[in-house]
């Protein structure tokens, strides 16, 4: 509500989803209640958790969920839940806006709908802190004829190859490289 986002544009939720009989129903109930304020539509939003692939990664759990969500938006596909056989019987998915991502789900291409494709990512900390962010697909950029030049510098045992994306980036990269080489002669630079 505060961000002015229509919840029906959220097509995927990367849940904290640790696979517990108590925790998962509570999380899905919270998601259902949040959507219910804005839509009565059922089963339009896939829900998954990368923990089915890796288990709980403790402090990195939220970060890996964020990475999965970003890749899902980029690839326009939601990967299926690994090792998923049947839903938790304590979760009434048929009455919820979410459904388990039990199969590869296409998100569609930009422009197919008037709305921007979004996803949510939830992460719960051991101290009781809950975090939820909403991400959206990157805007479609116009293609240009600009092709970056490959910048090469060969000095003794040093090789730097940089493929800038824009003319501005080319200029800034060159300034940075010259400055860095002057400050750290003989060191290898990674960037």
Predicted regions span which residues?
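Condensing-enzyme catalytic core of the thiolase-fold
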Residues: 1-143, 153, 189
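Flexible, low-complexity linker/boundary loops enriched in proline and small hydrophobic residues
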Residues: 121, 134-191
């Amino acid at each position: 509500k505060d961000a002015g986002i229509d919840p029906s544009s959220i097509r995927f939720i990367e849940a904290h989803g640790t696979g517990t009989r108590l925790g998962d129903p509570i999380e899905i109930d919270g998601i259902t209640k949040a959507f219910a304020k804005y839509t009565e539509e059922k089963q339009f939003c896939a829900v998954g958790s990368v923990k089915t692939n890796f288990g709980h990664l403790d402090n990195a759990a939220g970060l890996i969920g964020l990475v999965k969500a970003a890749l899902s938006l980029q690839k326009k596909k939601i990967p299926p839940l690994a090792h998923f056989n049947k839903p938790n019987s304590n979760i009434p998915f048929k009455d919820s806006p979410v459904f388990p991502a039990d199969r590869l789900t296409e998100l569609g291409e930009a422009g197919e709908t008037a709305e921007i494709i979004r996803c949510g990512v939830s992460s719960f900390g051991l101290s009781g802190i809950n975090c939820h962010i909403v991400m959206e697909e990157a805007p479609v950029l116009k293609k240009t004829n600009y092709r970056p030049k490959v910048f090469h510098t060969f000095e003794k045992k040093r090789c730097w190859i940089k493929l800038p994306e824009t003319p501005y980036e080319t200029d800034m990269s060159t300034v940075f490289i010259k400055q860095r080489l002057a400050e750290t002669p003989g060191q290898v630079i990674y960037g």
